[in-house]
Amino acid sequence: MNIGISQRVDLVRNERRDSLDQNWFRILKNFKLQILPIPNLLTNPIEWIENQKIEAFILSGGNDLSFFKKSNKKEVNECRDKLEILILRYCKKKKIPVIGICRGLQIINYFFNKKINLKKNIIHVNSKHNIYPNIQEKFRFFKEKK
C-alpha cells in the first residue's frame, strides 16, 4: 500500500528544504507500507498523487500553520498549507483515509472550520512523547501483505 506523507520545510544555509524524520520509515516498515514523501512545490499535486497510486495520507508534524505566524518566515510555510489543504479536499472527494500528526491534525481541524486556539509559552517542540511500544498490536489499520 502506498502512503503519502507531507513534509515540513526547514531553512538551512539560505535554502528551503523539504524534510522528514527518518523514524517514519523505521516505524512504518513494520506495516509493510511504501512511504512516499510528498514534495511541497509540486506543479500538479493531484496528478503526482494519482501517478503514485497513493491510497492513504499522513499529514506530518513540524512548522506552524501560516494562519498564525505571518511574521516568522523561517517557521511558516504557506505552500505546505496549500498543499495539505489540497490533499484534504482530494481525500474528502475520493474518500481516502488521512491522519494528522501534531501540525497535521491542526490543519485537518482548520480544514473542517473548527476553532484553533493559539497557546503561548508551551514547550512542545523537541519534547518526548510516550507511544505504545507495540503499536502494531494495538491497531490494525491496514491489511497485512503476505
Model region roles, listed by residue range:
Residues M1-R103, Y110, H124-K138, F142-K146:
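N-terminal beta1-alpha1 cap of cysteine-dependent amidohydrolase-like domains
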Residues N113-L118:
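Post-Walker A helix-loop "phosphate-sensing" segment adjacent to the P-loop in P-loop NTPases
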Residues N121:
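Glycine-rich beta-alpha loop elements in corrinoid/cobalamin-binding modules
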